[in-house]
């Protein structure tokens, strides 16, 4: 079904179940723990509490935040908050993830680990990642690189990278 012909409620439902978002400004809820922030999407989807806890714990471990599940965003570094935001976006295994600078505030090793996780999700689950970035490392690892200038596409190139 075409999204431009969908009702608002259907669009909201489609976004909730099919699209993950990584915002450059994180948009974490400061009074919730890292784990509760990650669980939020699944709670809105109606996932049972036990399953939410299990999945959120596992994904936080995958992004390197094991042991920090009970910390609230103000108690985390910028890079840790970024990884909570990524975990929240991918925990429900959406079809598409829209990510604005997902490796901002991360050191190169952590950024590479995160890109490896994205590649794994793409290969195993068919998740498509649409990433806005200035990071050359992400650009090198992408399956397709679309460059914009002043809002216009100036190049659209298939690459040998793995993330797409």
Residue locations for each model-derived region?
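Conserved beta-strand-loop-alpha-helix hinge in the C-terminal portion
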Residues: 144, 152-164
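ABC family nucleotide-binding domain
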Residues: 1-141, 145
């Amino acid at each position: 079904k075409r999204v431009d012909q969908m009702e608002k409620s259907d669009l909201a439902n489609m976004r909730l179940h099919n699209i993950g978002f990584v915002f450059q400004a994180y948009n974490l809820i400061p009074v919730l723990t890292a784990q509760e922030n990650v669980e939020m999407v699944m709670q809105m989807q109606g996932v049972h509490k036990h399953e939410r806890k299990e999945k959120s714990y596992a994904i936080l471990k995958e992004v390197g935040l094991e042991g920090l599940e009970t910390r609230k965003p103000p108690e985390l570094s910028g890079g840790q908050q970024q990884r909570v935001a990524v975990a929240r976006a991918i925990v429900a295994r959406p079809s598409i993830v829209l990510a604005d600078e997902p490796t901002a505030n991360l050191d190169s090793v952590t950024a590479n680990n995160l890109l490896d996780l994205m590649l794994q999700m793409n290969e195993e689950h068919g998740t498509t990642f649409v990433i806005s970035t200035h990071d050359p490392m992400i650009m090198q690892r992408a399956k397709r690189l679309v460059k914009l200038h002043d809002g216009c596409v100036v190049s659209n190139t298939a690459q040998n990278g793995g993330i797409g």
